Amino acid sequence: MERTYVMVKPDGVQRNLIGNIVSRFEQKGYTLAAAKLVTLSKETAETHYSEHRERPFFGELVSFITSGPVFAMVWEGEGVIKAARQLIGATNPSEAAPGTIRGDLAVNVGMNVVHGSDSPESAEREIAIFFKEEELNDYQKDSNKWV
Ligand code: RTP
Ligand code: MG
């Protein structure tokens, strides 16, 4: 079954948005495979965002993402990688459609409340950064038969 990495960023944790964000994935019909509140080290943050190493905002991005705890999650279900990106909305919240997480809950491109893996390769890489294999729960929910 397909899995993706989703993370409530420090601004989302500070603004009490964990429940709101988790709820959207649950209501859509996805299954939570793993979750934890964790404060990223500079090294982990740089590894996670390594594709942006050369970008002018990299320092700011790493400093922001390590500024407080994040809520790290693995979500599972049919087409979840692409669907998570759709639920999250455009990178810049000012361009994100209403109804999406960023469209509803954020204003600033730097503080856009949530991260979601952008491809199957990224999902696999990012899940491995944050979770050990034994932390990934493999279970069925009865409600899955309705979605
Ligand atoms: P994320 O990785 O955090 O889920 O966001 P994303 O895929 O929608 O966007 P991405 O291109 O991967 O950028 C990663 C994060 O860098 C910050 N950013 N700032 N100042 C800027 O122009 C700028 N561009 C990107 C954003 O916080 C974005 O989420
Ligand atoms: Mg990205």
From Swiss-Prot:
SMART domains: NDK. Its main location: cytoplasm. ATP binds at residues 9, 57, 85, 91, 102, 112. Its EC number is 2.7.4.6. The active site is at residue 115. It is found in: Cytoplasm. It is an enzyme of class 2 (transferase). One of its GO terms (biological process) is GTP biosynthetic process. Pfam families: NDK (PF00334). Gene3D superfamilies: Nucleoside diphosphate kinase-like domain. Keywords: ATP-binding, Cytoplasm, Kinase, Magnesium, Metal-binding, Nucleotide metabolism, Nucleotide-binding, Phosphoprotein, Transferase. Its cofactor is Mg(2+). It catalyses: a 2'-deoxyribonucleoside 5'-diphosphate + ATP = a 2'-deoxyribonucleoside 5'-triphosphate + ADP; a ribonucleoside 5'-diphosphate + ATP = a ribonucleoside 5'-triphosphate + ADP. The modification Phosphothreonine is found at residue 91. Belongs to the NDK family. Major role in the synthesis of nucleoside triphosphates other than ATP. The ATP gamma phosphate is transferred to the NDP beta phosphate via a ping-pong mechanism, using a phosphorylated active-site intermediate. This is Nucleoside diphosphate kinase. It comes from Shouchella clausii (strain KSM-K16).
